[in-house]
Amino acid sequence: MHEPMKTLKNIHAEIRICQKFPKSTVQKRFSEFEELIKAASKNARNWKPISSVELFQGDSSLNELFEKLVIGTCELRDGELFENVNDLTINPSNIHVYKLHKDGPLSQNIGDDDGDESIIGSQLWQLPCVEFDSIWENLIYDSNLKNEVMSYVAALARLSEKHVNTKIINVNRLILLTGPPGTGKTSLCKGLAQHLSIRMNDKYSKSVMLEINSHSLFSKWFSESGKLVQKMFDQIDELAEDEKCMVFVLIDEVESLGMCRESSSSRSEPSDAIRAVNALLTQIDRIRRRDNVLILCTSNLESTLDKALVDRADIVKNVGQPSDFARYSMLKSSIMELARIGVVIDNEVHTDYWPQDICDTKAPRNEFTEILFKIAQEARGLSGRAISMLPTLVYSKSPEETITLPNCMNLFLEAVKERLSRNN
């Protein structure tokens, strides 16, 4: 049975252009470009890159302009085909043209009042950047997590643009992702910031991410940690003074700064740790007046976080361990990447027999899809991070420069078992 045709209201196109071309060159050809998107849409997947060969079909004048194209909407599942979309019309305001920054991060120093010492408190990234490229589309979750987070943050941004009265409608612009280590929380934050910097580049001429080293904010000097937290947020406030600059703040492992004060008191923790929590909460309240600041926090230990910090979060999402289907997709992506660079190769295997995209249990599967799905089931207990490390282990086990597809499957199964035994 065919799925009913869908009508989508909010489709976005992200176009990365070559450094040597100005944006105006591309903008003049939007209408021509939109027709090509419609023609290629049947094979396009939500938030997945479209092949330039497939898109431009030999038009070298267009092909040389573009490095990457992604189309997507929060109305479809991540990776879902656009083949059942009724009308793939993209509003010109939803076509986002961008270039990547290649300068790398800049270390930001903070120090004690006497100026005798300074420590690296954060890394400053210009967005969108090379280092965060492709993070978003390569994050695989079973739930609609990516769309939910993106939709919520977009709603926060729209409310901020309308200058909502925050005394009536509480908007803190604070996102908290929780879950066990290795599930992609930090990567999701970086991918989200990259994605939003592209989507909002018509409003903000510049976007930056300040990645805070929360461990460095604990001074060796008693009672200084609260002051260091304040100094860090002074830097954030200074960046946000430019209303044309979107500032993303990433606080990884926020439990280092935001541990529950009640439990700290009961365990006779140093009062400096409690001062740091107080300072963090005060600075979050202070920075909320800035419409162009979004704070992204991750935590491996949600139960240890101070309740006042969790309560300030606009949205709290748990990022769990991947399911069988998510692990399968990760393994398949790894194999296809190894095939792309010429490591996995098998001329005797027809294209139709390579592992397939599977969205549900009813999808018909070929032989290698079945084998890989069994490997994914065997890999229960491995995090996304652990799975992403398997290809190197697989390649190290091969005596040859290239690996046949059947042998690749055997090596992946061996690598999964080895990694599981290491975890146990």
From Swiss-Prot:
GO terms for biological process: meiotic recombination checkpoint signaling; reciprocal meiotic recombination. PROSITE patterns: AAA (PS00674). One of its GO terms (molecular function) is ATP binding. It comes from Caenorhabditis elegans. Pfam families: AAA, AAA_lid_TRIP13_C, Pch2_N. GO terms for cellular component: chromosome; kinetochore; nucleus. This is Putative pachytene checkpoint protein 2. Gene3D superfamilies: P-loop containing nucleotide triphosphate hydrolases. Keywords: ATP-binding, Meiosis, Nucleotide-binding. The keyword Nucleotide-binding applies. It comes from the Eukaryota.
